[in-house]
Amino acid sequence: MDLYPESILNLIKSLSTLPGIGRRTAERLALHILHAPLHEAQTLANDILELKQKVTLCRTCFSLSDQPECRICSNPRRDASIICVVEKPTDIVAIEKSGAFSGLYHVLGGALSPMDGIGPDELRIRELFSRACSKTTTEVIIATGTNVEGEATAAYISDQLRKKGVNVTRIASGVPMGGDFQYVDQVTMQRAMEGRRGF
């Protein structure tokens, strides 16, 4: 039997639908919000509404943006001749944190997965081909995941773009910094050995 008032139970139920939030965490969050000052609860509610109302997809790269074009695509200092292809907007965040890339991005919206009914038409591959085949593009870097779906997506895009004469590269994968060899799987070790370079 639930001993909380219905409004608290409703919030617990809503919060527990979020990824990684179970009932106990949702309960703690709901009680925290209940005991927080009213202006904090209003700010949280307003931020959620603003997020839903303002955040959309960039018309160029399909990343998250609150403007028609995202901050990266509208930045004249970015190298518009190189496009890095990723599966989701959070992949851009990871690459940007590294500081290793200064070009533009293209978010596919997932990876090919025939078992789940996701083919090329369900992703933003057609839009990628249109951008990649422009005269200003000199290279397309494929930065999809290293799982089966990511590799299949990379292979498909690479094959199609090479037929169109586009220079395509794939990000390297291998042993992580500080990684212990005994925990590295065979495929990762094989790729690390194949992708080795001069020192």
From Swiss-Prot:
Cross-referenced Pfam families: RecR_C, RecR_HhH, RecR_ZnF, Toprim_4
Superkingdom of origin organism: Bacteria
Family matches, as InterPro entries: DNA_Rcmb_RecR, Rcmb_RecR, Rcmb_RecR_Znf, TOPRIM_dom, TOPRIM_RecR
Protein name: Recombination protein RecR
Transmembrane stretches, start-end: none
Gene designation per UniProt: recR
Function: May play a role in DNA repair. It seems to be involved in an RecBC-independent recombinational process of DNA repair. It may act with RecF and RecO.
Similarity remark: Belongs to the RecR family.
An annotated Gene Ontology molecular function: DNA binding
Domain Toprim: 81-176
Gene3D superfamilies: 3.40.1360.10, 6.10.250.240, RecR Domain 1
CDD domains, alphabetized: TOPRIM_recR (cd01025)
ZnF C4-type: positions: 58-73
UniProt KW keywords: DNA damage, DNA recombination, DNA repair, Metal-binding, Zinc, Zinc-finger
Organism encoding this protein: Desulforapulum autotrophicum (strain ATCC 43914 / DSM 3382 / VKM B-1955 / HRM2)
Swiss-Prot/TrEMBL GO biological process terms: DNA recombination; DNA repair
